[in-house]
Amino acid sequence: MINPIYLIIADLLDRYIGEPPEKLHPVVFIGNFVKFLEKVFPSTHSVEKLKDLVFGFITVFLTVFTVFLIFFTLELILNLISNYYIKLFSYSLILSFSIGHKSLLEFSKAPIKYIMSGDIKSARKSVQHIVSRDTSTLDEKHVISAAVESSSENITDSIIAPLIYAAIFGLSGAFIYRAVNTMDAMLGYKNEKYRYYGKTAAYLDDILNFIPSRIAGILLIISAPFYGGKIVPAIYGYLKEGFKTPSPNSGYTMAVIANSLSMELEKIGCYKLGKGEITVLKAVNSLKAVDYSVLLFLVIYMVLYFNLIY
């Protein structure tokens, strides 16, 4: 377990300063490395299923192993720094690159702001950046829903999960998680090219998100009163609707947000979560839930850490 001060500073750096330029971003490097491995071990587009499975596995293994070596070595180097404050800042700064707190909020706020100004066309284009569905014909209600779904789901992927793995395994844990999450985003499709090639990445992402997604859901339940939600409906959503999405993990945070704020989130033809009118105010409150759930996680981790260590 690492000192919670590292996690707090890392999250604050990302929340208020944001991510580094693309050329310096470790996650961008990971993505480029995966693209390189795809060329070395290419997909057969499901023509040779076993070959796709093997090459997909090799791509995931080499990526995870490389990320582990880099960040484990980096952590060893940081531990050699004798000045506490230099080490604290350096470690926290690097760790902040594994978190997407500010970007999550910015991307989710954008379509909501366009809706508030009455610009539905720009809202559709904006929300297309954060969801995979076709948004070109979505009405106002479904644009807001897509934005809330994205922010709710990505509480786990972008913040809570990296912090959990950092807390337990340090830098290498946080960045291995981000590597797997990145590979799932790049390879985890059920189309001809990735149906078999991306299975390892998709399954590993499901495994690594299983516990963090459920912890994130519980954090959202406990913090519900702070973002304008209700605890009892949130619990109902967690227990009764968390499993309704195609992903085994993404539904828990979305169902809690939907039910705690009494609004229906709908991906047309796929799922419906919660009941009630979806409004801009409720969407804004759902974004507040991001900050409160992260704050609660950091407080709980700090209490656990100092009680276990001292």
Swiss-Prot record:
Localization (cell): Cell membrane
Positions in coiled-coil regions: none
Record keyword Membrane present: yes
Membrane topology listed for this record: Multi-pass membrane protein
Pathway(s) where this gene product acts: Cofactor biosynthesis; adenosylcobalamin biosynthesis
Purpose: Converts cobyric acid to cobinamide by the addition of aminopropanol on the F carboxylic group.
The protein's name in its UniProt record: Probable cobalamin biosynthesis protein CobD
